């Protein structure tokens, strides 16, 4: 079972049952120097959004007739390795609801076959192409559906990339909330157009891999984030993705403001379900469930994979324990009904009740036959892999994304594009393949050959791999290859020869350590791996023309060689997936002009970043990760600190040039009030009888054949559990069953719909002024006035558009819309979004990077070219 070692590695980070982590204790930490997450109860019911009304009506009819066992079955996983998927719920055969399959990953079906390994999220972000973001989502959804996956665990919009060394930044779309928001929301729309359910992750503050999970000696770290920073930065892409209709949200491992995400009532009940109007279901990250009653009351709807503190022992915080909690009254039956209704309504909303496939693969083995429940001591066997090919023509989309993401940082003397008759010398193992096999390392937990993706659960097996070496050899008959990370002796260099040096930087999830890096880039830092810097310098000493190709998970330091005279060009190819070679040669040899742009800043030194975004650790006690930099991460920090980076956010050159002319700013809807119009009232939600179910509903069925370690909803003594209903149970601090007033910032999925009123529109004419075809990206940044009374970043990306391929001399007019929310700050006192009245003092900039602004507009004064 290929995935088994990976999950065994998780055991070192498990949450033990004896670990003291009660919500009540967390919520009483009120010292002014300590972060605090206030209580927010009860959990809001779903079903009040009109777009979900039909699905909730169907769910209500079914749930009204379910037994307690059937309800609990859908909220709890059946246990790790107790089915074909990363996790699966129980089923309700009486109503045609199967075991729901939840499975990775954000870039392709994990641990499967005949699937596409798409470029990673960071690569998609670098395209700045909304159409490709959506198309990739469609491809992911089609492949998930084809494999029988009900819930695909992605996209990831958290981490956002606060910490440049963070291990999983590459799963998201870039170090900016708007870029993440467009990437996440468009991916969700694409995925769910196919009927697959997207599970948006990780809510929230999982910005570092090390110490995120609790262990026998310490709790996972607490991400301590102030309310304004939470809303304007980290929550922003989640809000946009909820607005896109996300069916599921995955909760992170860590704490937020000293309250574990899986039972953080403010985060789940207050912000996600009430303020953002989330209508789907909330699921744990795998083994992130640390308590039973407290998590249910805090708004958690599904536990995955269902196991308790130590997997493989057949224990659970829910399953039969949830049945017990409902019978004894510690979990109100109303809460269970809402949990189940949310799950079933999402199933109906995506049309999964109509001819949706069952799982036809196994993530546990590549064999055709095997145990149906691999985690059981004794398991029946059968066909587990049907080898269904779901790739379709998705390789075309994968290649287009990988190609359009390639970012040209430098091109002195126009050394690129190459001519097919150039004499080339290629260096670096990153140009080649993994000699052990392209899928030989579990979850890509090694760095051998071309880097196509990071490592961890967010990966996919490669159906094939076109390496740069193969692709270049296919085009050039004058290429010599030195697939080594040590510069070979005896290499000769003619005056016109061109050296292409391949280097990379890797990272991933913390259950695998690669070359001393436990997920985060702890040992390597932001330097190239495998002697990369020295390899470039050695080539630069020998050759007059050096092209550097970088495959990387994020920012990488280049100072040792970037200014060398012979280093003429640098391409960042990000994480290209299976089409690594063809996408690169499309650009290298000029079939296409590069049109990618950096989705993060590349610094001169790691010391350019604020100290607070470094990796944090301590030997004992819970780590307090204080977000003292506030809104100022990545380019926002560089601008505030007046630090010129090596390459700014949004930077990307082309083989041609573009002019931005004829800018025009139009008022679409007046900002005549500081705060948005009053939110619409909540609609009605499903109602159910409030009487406790009969204990017999969770009694073991007669002659039932139990599977060892399978997690069931049944109790050995249900009558005994019901008899305890007269007892008084302790509840989390602040718990109440009285509904709270509807938050004024809410009113629809994502928040008050007035926030998305388009207030201004900028039009700009983009002209190809060069001699080659190419595409330009217009990036719109806003600067908010000091009249708001708050410190705000001097530039904030809020919109972007990409031209079609423009021939030399051809133009296209782009329209970039700006919403009320785009111009708002979060008022922590009023608890609403505040904008400058009439947009007074707002400045809008449009350009090709945050440092290359071509157009400036001032509301009320108009626009000019810069």
Swiss-Prot record:
Indicate the transmembrane segments per the record. Answer: none
Which EC class is this protein assigned?
A: hydrolase
Q: Which Gene3D superfamilies match?
A: Glycoside hydrolase family 3 C-terminal domain (3.40.50.1700), Glycoside hydrolase, family 3, N-terminal domain (3.20.20.300), Immunoglobulins (2.60.40.10)
Tell me which residues this entry annotates as catalytic: 285
Classification via SMART domains: Fn3_like
Source domain of life: Eukaryota
An example Pfam family from this entry, by short name, is Glyco_hydro_3
What GO biological process terms are annotated to this protein in UniProt?
Answer: cellulose catabolic process
According to the UniProt record, one GO cellular component term is: extracellular region
Q: In which pathway does it act?
A: Glycan metabolism; cellulose degradation
The record, for InterPro entries, names: Cellulose_deg_GH3, Fn3-like, Glyco_hydro_3_AS, Glyco_hydro_3_C, Glyco_hydro_3_C_sf, Glyco_hydro_3_N, Glyco_hydro_3_N_sf, Glycoside_hydrolase_SF
Q: What is its main location?
A: secreted
Q: Which transformation does this protein catalyse, written as a reaction?
A: Hydrolysis of terminal, non-reducing beta-D-glucosyl residues with release of beta-D-glucose
Extract the signal peptide range. 1-20
Q: Give the SUPFAM superfamilies listed for this entry.
A: (Trans)glycosidases (SSF51445), Beta-D-glucan exohydrolase, C-terminal domain (SSF52279)
The subcellular location is: Secreted
Is Membrane among this UniProt entry's keywords?
Answer: no
Q: What is its EC number?
A: 3.2.1.21
User: Which family does the record claim for this protein?
Assistant: Belongs to the glycosyl hydrolase 3 family.
According to its UniProt entry, the function of this protein is described as: Beta-glucosidases are one of a number of cellulolytic enzymes involved in the degradation of cellulosic biomass. Catalyzes the last step releasing glucose from the inhibitory cellobiose.
Report what the protein is called: Probable beta-glucosidase F
Instruction: Report the source organism.
Output: Aspergillus flavus (strain ATCC 200026 / FGSC A1120 / IAM 13836 / NRRL 3357 / JCM 12722 / SRRC 167)
As recorded in Swiss-Prot or TrEMBL, the protein's gene is named bglF
């Amino acid at each position: 079972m290929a995935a088994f070692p990976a999950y065994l590695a998780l055991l070192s980070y498990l949450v033990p049952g004896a670990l003291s982590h009660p919500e009540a204790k967390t919520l009483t930490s009120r010292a002014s120097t300590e972060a605090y997450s206030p209580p927010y109860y009860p959990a809001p019911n779903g079903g009040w959004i009109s777009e979900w009304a039909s699905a909730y009506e169907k769910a209500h009819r079914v749930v009204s007739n379910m037994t307690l066992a059937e309800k609990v079955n859908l909220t709890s996983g059946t246990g790790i390795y107790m089915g074909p998927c990363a996790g699966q719920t129980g089923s309700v055969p009486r109503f045609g609801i199967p075991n729901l399959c939840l499975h990775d990953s954000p870039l392709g079906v994990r641990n499967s076959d005949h699937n596409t390994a798409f470029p990673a999220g960071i690569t998609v972000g670098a395209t700045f192409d909304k159409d490709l973001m959506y198309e990739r989502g469609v491809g992911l959804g089609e492949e998930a559906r084809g494999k029988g996956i009900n819930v695909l665990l992605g996209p990831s919009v958290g981490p956002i990339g606060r910490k440049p060394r963070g291990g999983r930044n590459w799963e998201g779309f870039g170090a900016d909330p708007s870029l993440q928001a467009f990437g996440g929301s468009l991916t969700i729309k694409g995925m769910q157009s196919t009927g697959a359910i997207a599970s948006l992750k990780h809510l929230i503050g999982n910005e570092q891999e090390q110490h995120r999970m609790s262990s026998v000696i310490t709790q996972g770290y607490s991400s301590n984030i102030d309310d304004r920073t939470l809303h304007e930065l980290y929550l922003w892409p989640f809000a946009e993705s909820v607005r896109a209709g996300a069916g599921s949200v995955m909760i992170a491992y860590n704490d937020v403001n000293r309250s574990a995400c899986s039972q953080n009532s403010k985060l789940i009940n207050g912000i996600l379900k009430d303020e953002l109007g989330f209508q789907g279901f909330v699921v744990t990250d795998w083994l992130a469930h640390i308590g039973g009653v407290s998590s249910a009351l805090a708004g958690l709807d599904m536990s995955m994979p269902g196991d308790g503190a130590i997997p493989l022992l057949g224990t659970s915080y829910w399953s039969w324990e949830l049945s017990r909690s409902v019978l004894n009254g510690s979990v109100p039956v109303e809460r269970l009904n809402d949990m189940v209704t949310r799950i079933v309504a999402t199933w109906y909303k995506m049309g999964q009740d109509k001819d949706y496939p069952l799982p036809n693969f196994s993530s546990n083995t590549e064999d055709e036959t095997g145990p149906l429940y691999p985690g059981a001591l004794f398991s029946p066997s059968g066909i587990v892999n049907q080898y269904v090919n779901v790739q379709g023509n998705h390789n075309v989309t994968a290649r287009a994304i990988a190609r359009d993401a390639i970012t040209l940082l430098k091109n002195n003397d126009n050394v690129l594009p190459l001519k097919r008759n150039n004499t080339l010398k290629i260096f670096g193992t990153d140009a080649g393949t993994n000699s052990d096999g392209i899928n030989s390392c579990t979850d890509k937990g090694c760095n051998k050959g071309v880097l196509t993706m990071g490592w961890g659960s967010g990966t996919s097996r490669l159906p094939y791999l076109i390496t740069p070496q193969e692709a270049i050899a296919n085009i050039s008959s004058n290429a010599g290859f030195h697939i080594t990370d040590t510069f070979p002796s005896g290499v000769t260099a003619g005056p016109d020869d061109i050296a292409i040096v391949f280097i990379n930087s890797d990272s991933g999830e913390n259950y695998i350590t690669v070359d001393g890096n436990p997920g985060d880039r702890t040992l390597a830092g932001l330097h190239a791996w495998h002697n990369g810097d020295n390899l470039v310098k050695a080539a630069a000493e020998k050759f007059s023309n050096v092209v550097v190709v970088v495959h990387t998970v994020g920012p990488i330091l280049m100072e040792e060689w970037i200014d060398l005279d012979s280093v003429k060009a640098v391409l960042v190819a990000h994480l290209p997936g299976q089409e690594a070679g063809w996408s690169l040669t499309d650009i290298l040899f000029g079939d296409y002009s590069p049109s990618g742009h950096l989705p993060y800043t590349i610094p001169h030194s790691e010391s350019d970043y604020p100290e607070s975004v470094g990796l944090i650790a301590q030997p004992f006690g819970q780590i307090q990760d204080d977000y003292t930099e506030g809104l100022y991460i990545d380019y926002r920090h560089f601008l505030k600190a007046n630090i010129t980076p090596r390459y700014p956010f949004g930077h990307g050159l082309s083989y041609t040039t573009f002019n931005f002319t004829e800018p025009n700013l139009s008022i679409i809807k007046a900002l005549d009030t500081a705060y948005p119009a009053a939110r619409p009232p909540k609609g009605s939600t499903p109602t159910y009888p409030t009487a406790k179910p009969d204990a017999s509903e969770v009694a073991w069925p007669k002659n039932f054949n139990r599977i060892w370690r399978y997690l069931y909803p049944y109790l050995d003594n249900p009558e005994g559990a019901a008899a305890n209903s007269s007892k008084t149970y302790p509840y989390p601090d602040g718990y109440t069953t009285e509904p709270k007033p509807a938050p004024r910032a809410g009113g629809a999925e994502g928040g008050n719909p007035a926030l998305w009123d388009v207030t201004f529109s900028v039009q700009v004419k983009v002209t190809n002024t060069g001699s080659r075809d190419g595409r330009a990206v217009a990036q719109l940044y806003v600067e908010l006035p000091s009249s708001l009374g708050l410190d705000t970043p001097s530039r904030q990306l809020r919109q972007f558009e990409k031209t079609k391929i423009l021939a030399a001399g051809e133009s296209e007019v782009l329209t970039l819309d700006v919403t009320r929310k785009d111009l708002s700050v979060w008022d922590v006192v009023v608890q609403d979004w505040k904008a400058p009245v009439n947009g007074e003092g707002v400045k809008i900039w449009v350009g090709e990077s945050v440092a290359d602004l071509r157009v400036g507009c001032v509301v009320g004064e108009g626009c000019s070219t810069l």
